[in-house]
Amino acid sequence: MSQSNNVTDLARANIRALTPYMSARRLGGNGDVWLNANEYPLGTEYQLTTQTFNRYPECQPKHVIERYAAYAGLPPEQVLVSRGADEGIELLIRAFCEPGQDAILFCPPTYGMYAVSAETFGVERRTVPAQADWQLDLPAIANNLDQVKVIYVCSPNNPTGNLINPADLQAVLALAQGRAIVAIDEAYIEFCPQASVSNWLKDYPNLVILRTLSKAFALAGLRCGFTLANSDIIQLLLKVIAPYPLSTPVADIAAQALSPKGIEQMRQRVSEVRANRAWLQSALQDCACVEQVFTSESNYLLARFTASSSVFNALWDQGIILRDQNKQPGLANCLRITIGTRQECERVIAALAPLPGIDNSNNIDNQSKTHSQTSSIRKGTI
């Protein structure tokens, strides 16, 4: 056995077997129209106001916390800032789940980092597939809460774009009361702010809300997210977060983005994205290769195609990079399209328009069977 193999064998067994989250950048591509990561299509400009970098930053930069708290309508003690919402996902597992004993629960098709974070810490991943309309299966959730410490619900859901029914969210919070944390992932909430549940925090001590500056604030490269919760939970998370989660430049830019001017600019971007989303949704429905375009409350559209692999490759060859969702339960022949500029949306339609429609009844039949088979509860223990 080679020396390198010996070193690899020192790693934990679950890490050796782990399939990492395949981010858009990790998947690569050589395109010039990047519509696969739900980013804002244009760069934002900021000037650093702090030029002193020889000192460590604050663990929780006061200016950032206060500005986000004001934006969210919460007291500062209910806000924690982290390296993206992904770190918030991980912090909840680190704080609440005993490896090899506890579980998290989530409802696919949904965001993949819930599963990866649990795998990394040796925590069971318990899945309760969403119903055919992508709403929560409440009876199945109720029957699978043993040893569950954290329930993740994404609303608007990635990659489907739909909001979860508020009454169902309240039902899950009630089911989990005294048993589990319910983390509502609101990464895309700026595109439908009326649907936020942040005003529920006063009524549900087990509610946690995850937020980010990556989407509507157009700062995906900054890696800055927020966890909103009651102060007791925030204090627990502060015990497990890194001592300096935000660098000084990141905190500087985040504070600028959360200024009154920054928030006004964010809302202007949201209006532009909504207009382009409406245009793209209408145009997609006229393409022969498109079977269905699903309603979205976010900055992307999910569409089912007659032959998604051919469509994906055809656009890839033209420098238009989409996100393939075929491996997600219930999403056979589906691609997710980030809303880009109007020009980028027009390029997508120009590339799709010549592609033929195909009789895909067999594929849809198979899709229905697959969804039916996955409706039973699946458990994965790491």
Swiss-Prot record:
<comment type="pathway">
    <text>Amino-acid biosynthesis; L-histidine biosynthesis; L-histidine from 5-phospho-alpha-D-ribose 1-diphosphate: step 7/9.</text>
</comment>
<keyword id="KW-0368">Histidine biosynthesis</keyword>
<dbReference type="InterPro" id="IPR004839">
    <property type="entry name" value="Aminotransferase_I/II_large"/>
</dbReference>
<dbReference type="InterPro" id="IPR015421">
    <property type="entry name" value="PyrdxlP-dep_Trfase_major"/>
</dbReference>
<dbReference type="InterPro" id="IPR015422">
    <property type="entry name" value="PyrdxlP-dep_Trfase_small"/>
</dbReference>
<dbReference type="GO" id="GO:0004400">
    <property type="term" value="F:histidinol-phosphate transaminase activity"/>
</dbReference>
<dbReference type="InterPro" id="IPR015424">
    <property type="entry name" value="PyrdxlP-dep_Trfase"/>
</dbReference>
<protein>
    <recommendedName>
        <fullName>Histidinol-phosphate aminotransferase</fullName>
        <ecNumber>2.6.1.9</ecNumber>
    </recommendedName>
</protein>
<dbReference type="Pfam" id="PF00155">
    <property type="entry name" value="Aminotran_1_2"/>
</dbReference>
<dbReference type="GO" id="GO:0000105">
    <property type="term" value="P:L-histidine biosynthetic process"/>
</dbReference>
<comment type="subunit">
    <text>Homodimer.</text>
</comment>
<keyword id="KW-0028">Amino-acid biosynthesis</keyword>
<keyword id="KW-0808">Transferase</keyword>
<dbReference type="GO" id="GO:0030170">
    <property type="term" value="F:pyridoxal phosphate binding"/>
</dbReference>
<keyword id="KW-0032">Aminotransferase</keyword>
<keyword id="KW-0663">Pyridoxal phosphate</keyword>
<dbReference type="InterPro" id="IPR001917">
    <property type="entry name" value="Aminotrans_II_pyridoxalP_BS"/>
</dbReference>
<feature type="region of interest" description="Disordered">
    <location>
        <begin position="360"/>
        <end position="382"/>
    </location>
</feature>
<feature type="modified residue" description="N6-(pyridoxal phosphate)lysine">
    <location>
        <position position="215"/>
    </location>
</feature>
<dbReference type="InterPro" id="IPR005861">
    <property type="entry name" value="HisP_aminotrans"/>
</dbReference>
<comment type="similarity">
    <text>Belongs to the class-II pyridoxal-phosphate-dependent aminotransferase family. Histidinol-phosphate aminotransferase subfamily.</text>
</comment>
